[in-house]
Amino acid sequence: MTCQLQAQPLIPYNVLAGVPTSNTGSPIGNAGNQFDQFEQTVKELKEAWEAFQKNGSFSLAALEKGFDAAIGGGSFDYLGLVQAGLGLVGTLGAAIPGVSVAVPLISMLVGVFWPKGTNNQENLITVIDKEVQRILDEKLSDQLIKKLNADLNAFTDLVTRLEEVIIDATFENHKPVLQVSKSNYMKVDSAYFSTGGILTLGMSDFLTDTYSKLTFPLYVLGATMKLSAYHSYIQFGNTWLNKVYDLSSDEGKTMSQALARAKQHMRQDIAFYTSQALNMFTGNLPSLSSNKYAINDYNVYTRAMVLNGLDIVATWPTLYPDDYSSQIKLEKTRVIFSDMVGQSESRDGSVTIKNIFDNTDSHQHGSIGLNSISYFPDELQKAQLRMYDYNHKPYCTDCFCWPYGVILNYNKNTFRYGDNDPGLSGDVQLPAPMSVVNAQTQTAQYTDGENIWTDTGRSWLCTLRGYCTTNCFPGRGCYNNSTGYGESCNQSLPGQKIHALYPFTQTNVLGQSGKLGLLASHIPYDLSPNNTIGDKDTDSTNIVAKGIPVEKGYASSGQKVEIIREWINGANVVQLSPGQSWGMDFTNSTGGQYMVRCRYASTNDTPIFFNLVYDGGSNPIYNQMTFPATKETPAHDSVDNKILGIKGINGNYSLMNVKDSVELPSGKFHVFFTNNGSSAIYLDRLEFVPLDQPAAPTQSTQPINYPITSRLPHRSGEPPAIIWEKSGNVRGNQLTISAQGVPENSQIYLSVGGDRQILDRSNGFKLVNYSPTYSFTNIQASSSNLVDITSGTITGQVQVSNL
């Protein structure tokens, strides 16, 4: 029987369409351009977001097609897309020179997940339920599906109303207004308070005791939607409150208090929803033993919950506008694992995982527990396999063989493991980046073999003639007991790459025990071991704030510092005990003024010596400072922004301003923490927030002057004429254009900035101050097939902005 692939995430994603597969359907060969495709979709989302700030119209046609494809049996990484979208929150106004517009974040979420005019609420639940069945072998009841669908419909109606009143208040004729009216401000205020109350009542349905792990992704999306409603209202209030009201008047004081309450409630809800998500996650966490199947079950659950919820939960604190007013990129260094592959695919057994990183001198290594595995700060270049092969004539050829060793080549070091020493050169090359690894094993009368492959290479040196007679089960693969055959069924994880391959041994192996077993750890595809700040947004050229996990550093020589799981942060934390020091290396690509912050948890006030030093000796920060004890944000009391935080497993996480403003030149620098206190402190990430953004792009105009000296190309079947093209490093934003000397019954079709417009006698062959959906670099023109245009002139001007 053909083995059906298990689905790893609860929401489908774009997985290796058309990639060659093994007899189980597992992908082999190159993974293709799945990451490039996703990045292109994110680019489209960004362009739509920028256009929305410009004209108040949010277009997500490409994303709706992706959703329709998922419903029809295809796949689309919606949760990855939302994470990318949330990272654009701070780009508000960045696309409009000199304008800061409080456009609602909720427009993005509603547009991505539930496009208007469709029944995608119910479809989304159906898709999730289908995937849940394949991952966890459990199913939502029809009654609950109907209830959740009703809740999501109500959610959508509410947030859509809030979205509409904000857009109506801030845009007129698709252009940002210069002043919001008092009546429109009150409409926004009223819509916000109606939305918040009903969303709160509906959230409880998503985390019932019976179905909590099945509805976890929907809970995360619902909470994200409510937090985005907070964000949209607060951003609107921050922008317009003091422009609409006299804050010393009774009316102004009332509206000011309403905004302050919204901020307080948002912080409380971020803490509450995070706590609920963590409790749900840990409450359903499978027990972890040393058995292979138990480890696989644990990893099936954790990777599903991380990819489908916890990665988004980690971004919730960044939605609070007063803490994160500019675009920020949070690096995620958490690791997740695919199913263990190799040694014996049809047998369970007690497993010992080998810590391949504990030395570079030997092929033998000590053991490591699954939850002790953390991010290794280097980039995998390739993996190599060493093969054992015995020609077992006259019975068969190449059926007594297996990989016995693995070699991992990183930028800085090479690590190896094997039943015997594999050396430094392998028989099989597996170039990075890799996204999936699988294995097949068979032990029978004249066969004892194993093959291992990834999406970039394979070890098809062994002749194994078995096949599966079962379907794949989560954490089990497939097998055929009568022939001693088994095969893993790992599948690429959305937006993830293999970061390391940990060898393991197991008991109860069929045949020779020297066959290779591997456990793959995965990290986000765009994660680099280099710590860089000062990166610029490619479109706006603004410097992007950066949140870099502290675990990307190193302990002082001779010290052993603990790295500990913290599921809600998107990264592990560094437990810095009294007297210990921790270092991190950075490169700043853009010098300027920065705010430096640290996110941490501590039960006591902790004195920390903080040293930021450049190569060459300059010391912008060289201070002993106290990191205050952090407390959980209370449900009802007033909120102290400095010390109250988000509760995790190891403490309550809060932001500490290390330096409100400091000049950080471009170049290489290092940060060192030393705990001079009497208790441990848990360090999550360092944040570098730029304070001096580049000047807004300058406006100018460029002329349009296109004489028609030959027939203008027809609209159908001919490439259009380019009648204007940018000059210099600019993009067009607006145009005024007209045609003279053309036939009165003719039509000129313009293509500009994603829009199509017609010049004909109905508009006097003229457009005045037209702003297309997107900025543009050229204008194209063609004519109707019915009337040729062979003479005349097209003139006008384009308003452009320097990049």
From Swiss-Prot:
InterPro entries: Galactose-bd-like_sf, Pest_crys_dom-III, Pest_crys_dom_I, Pest_crys_N_sf, Pest_cryst_dom_II. GO terms for biological process: sporulation resulting in formation of a cellular spore; symbiont-mediated killing of host cell. It holds the Pfam family Endotoxin_N. The keyword Nucleotide-binding does not apply. SUPFAM superfamilies: delta-Endotoxin (insectocide), N-terminal domain, Galactose-binding domain-like. Keywords: Sporulation, Toxin, Virulence. GO terms for molecular function: signaling receptor binding; toxin activity. Belongs to the delta endotoxin family. Toxic segment of the protein is located in the N-terminus. Endotoxin with nematicidal activity. This is Pesticidal crystal protein Cry13Aa.
